[in-house]
């Protein structure tokens, strides 16, 4: 599991849910 992909997923989730 790549940390970069994890970071990208976190950004997407943050943008969608507004929970950062």
Swiss-Prot record:
Function: Antimicrobial peptide with activity against Gram-negative and Gram-positive bacteria (MIC=50 uM against E.coli, MIC=6 uM against S.aureus) and fungi (MIC=13 uM against C.albicans). Shows hemolytic activity on human erythrocytes (HC(50)=25 uM).
A GO BP annotation: defense response to fungus
GO cellular component: extracellular region
Top-level taxon in the UniProt lineage: Eukaryota
Keyword Transmembrane: no
Family statement drawn from the similarity comment of this UniProt entry: Belongs to the frog skin active peptide (FSAP) family. Brevinin subfamily.
Free-text tissue specificity from the UniProt record: Expressed by the skin glands.
Species in which this protein is naturally found: Lithobates septentrionalis
InterPro entries attached to this UniProt entry: Antimicrobial_frog_1
Pfam families tied to this protein: Antimicrobial_1 (PF08018)
Keywords, sorted A to Z: Amphibian defense peptide, Antibiotic, Antimicrobial, Cytolysis, Disulfide bond, Fungicide, Hemolysis, Secreted
Name of the protein described by the UniProt record: Brevinin-1SPb
Subcellular location: Secreted
Disulfide links within the chain: 14-20
